[in-house]
């Protein structure tokens, strides 16, 4: 009996500690330099090294403001899985497109939406599954074929697996409908984006900056491909900040007005 392969975790062990992309304040202490990171994914004493070409530098995230987006070269099908680490900066006023592609609203769909302040929607084949949760905030989204988990509870799904193929490549920060891009693009930050064909990791995309010109985007360490914005403006990227050991970086601070 074949065992299900271990997928690469969203929490990494580094040589001197741990890196969780949701709270990665210590990661800079474990980098060898701006383009080399030593990690392992199953908490053993064997470490892999993620090495970027010297022309790129690791970023904590890239941020979109409803204009930039990424056009991948991956066409989703019924066995596609995405594991994405995303912070949603605002509650969507109406149907903010997050990632995916489809033939039409109800045909050959593999897409994810931020519908409003309390609803995500995950579409698969011909099914649309609403997910009730506060949408502003930081989430691990695991859209695995016909089911969807969010940090990490099962919160949406369809009746079963379907054999289908989208006619167009998947996009990130928007949705590709048979070649037409949704105008209501994501306002938020992407920390990592992994694409699987069932259990095979096809793309492992991490935020980087091109040192020569400052352009930010996602770098796929599988195919060694850089994906900058395909939109009219570039992404904004945040570099890692090295803090003293007695401080941690917060997502935000809030005032009560008193």
Model regions: which residues?
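Extended recognition patches within non-cytosolic domains
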Residues: 32-35, 50-54, 191-243
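Flexible glycan-contacting loops in extracellular carbohydrate-active proteins
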Residues: 157-189
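Extracellular structured ligand-interaction cores
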Residues: 79-83, 136-138, 145, 169, ...
